[in-house]
Amino acid sequence: LKCHNTQLPFIYKTCPEGKNLCFKATLKKFPLKIPIKRGCADNCPKNSALLKYVCCSTDKCN
């Protein structure tokens, strides 16, 4: 699986074994949905008071 791991959409990395999801975190209260954090995960992180996480399982989907 290949996931973006920076705010720039053309930079990505291959996820290590066992990390089979890509995630993207955005600020909940900010009108523009600019990714704050992206990367690989073994399960989808939980939303927090400030961040909303979206997960997916195909190459470069985040």
From Swiss-Prot:
One of its GO terms (molecular function) is toxin activity. It holds the Pfam family Toxin_cobra-type. One of its GO terms (cellular component) is extracellular region. Disulfide bonds join 3-22, 15-40, 44-55, 56-61. Keywords: Disulfide bond, Membrane, Secreted, Target cell membrane, Target membrane, Toxin. The keyword DNA-binding does not apply. Its main location: secreted. InterPro entries: Cytotoxin_Cobra, Snake_3FTx, Snake_toxin-like_sf, Snake_toxin_con_site, Toxin_cobra-type. Expressed by the venom gland. It comes from the Eukaryota. It is found in: Secreted; Target cell membrane. Is classified as a P-type cytotoxin, since a proline residue stands at position 31 (Pro-31 in standard classification). Has low cytotoxic activity. Belongs to the three-finger toxin family. Short-chain subfamily. Orphan group XV sub-subfamily. This is Cytotoxin homolog. It comes from Naja kaouthia (Monocled cobra).
